[in-house]
From Swiss-Prot:
GO terms for cellular component: cytosol. HAMAP family: UPF0250. Belongs to the UPF0250 family. This is UPF0250 protein PP_4802. PANTHER family: UPF0250 PROTEIN YBED (PTHR38036:SF1).
Length: 91
């Protein structure tokens, strides 16, 4: 029996249009904090910025695209966002 042809979904770096979704507590300045942290680590495309609140308003989601240079860079971004204490998830 042959194995199915499964294609790997690896990221090829640099990736000029890498989507980032950041979910965190709804607090004043959340969007600006996300942009500030991302801007320290990558070129941010603000034209792709989208912000949404959960139905009850407890959480906010900020989505945008960055230029991703490496896996290490993505790890650093994740760590920096999580270190804020208000970010719950980075996708």
């Amino acid at each position: 029996m042959s194995e199915p042809d499964v294609k790997s979904h690896k990221i090829e770096f640099p990736c000029d249009d890498y989507p980032i979704k950041v979910i965190g507590d709804t607090v004043v300045g959340f969007k600006d904090m996300v942009i500030e942290v991302l801007s320290k680590h990558a070129k941010v495309d603000l034209s792709t910025l989208a912000e949404r609140q959960s139905k009850e308003g407890k959480y906010t989601t900020v989505q945008l695209h960055i230029v991703a240079e490496s896996e290490n860079q993505l790890h650093d971004i994740n760590s920096a966002l999580r270190a804020t204490g208000i970010v719950k998830m980075v996708l």
